[in-house]
UniProtKB/Swiss-Prot annotation:
Full protein name: ATP synthase subunit delta
Originating species: Gloeobacter violaceus (strain ATCC 29082 / PCC 7421)
Record-level Gene Ontology MF annotations: proton-transporting ATP synthase activity, rotational mechanism
Quaternary structure and interacting proteins, as annotated: F-type ATPases have 2 components, F(1) - the catalytic core - and F(0) - the membrane proton channel. F(1) has five subunits: alpha(3), beta(3), gamma(1), delta(1), epsilon(1). CF(0) has four main subunits: a(1), b(1), b'(1) and c(10-14). The alpha and beta chains form an alternating ring which encloses part of the gamma chain. F(1) is attached to F(0) by a central stalk formed by the gamma and epsilon chains, while a peripheral stalk is formed by the delta, b and b' chains.
Gene coding for it: atpH
A GO cellular-component term linked to this record: proton-transporting ATP synthase complex
InterPro entries for this protein: ATP_synth_OSCP/delta_N_sf (IPR026015), ATPase_OSCP/d_CS (IPR020781), ATPase_OSCP/dsu (IPR000711)
Amino acid sequence: MQQGKDSEQIAQRYAEALKELALSETGLLEQFGNDTDGMLQVMEESPDFERFLVVPIIAMADKKRLLVEAFGGKVHPYMLNFLQLMVDRRRIALLRPVCTSYQRILRELQQTTLAEVISAVPLSEEQASALIERIRRRTAAVRVELRRRVDPELLGGMIIKIGDEVIDASLRGQLRKLTLQLTLS
């Protein structure tokens, strides 16, 4: 348990260092946000990529070569140097939590709230805009970042996650509540 907490703290420190580097030049804050988002996407789409970086018996030179092949010309040169530094310090296994922590730091700096919406069917742009506006009013955020996911098993409605708060307005959730009420009465 302690090792997980230590890793989390180390990842947070690396993300803070990345933020400090980003603040040193105009435009890097957003650029690094795009870079970390892209890296998270690559890790989501290719679990083998992340596994390759995590395995300790793979040579550091091979890990650096993979990073250059995957991200060279796609991320800012400072970011590529940062990734290679993580390899040198044997911290590249923390790439995902570092990227996630940086994204969280960036949202805080930009006063942006992250909301995840899981719906039974894809939301239209009008529905998404209306939802963003309601979340903005509810949280007093300057901006709202809406991540959408479709789960047909919800049957209808949606589940909205804003930070630690979960609003279950799905048909499946309503049926579950009704079933619970009927069994308790």
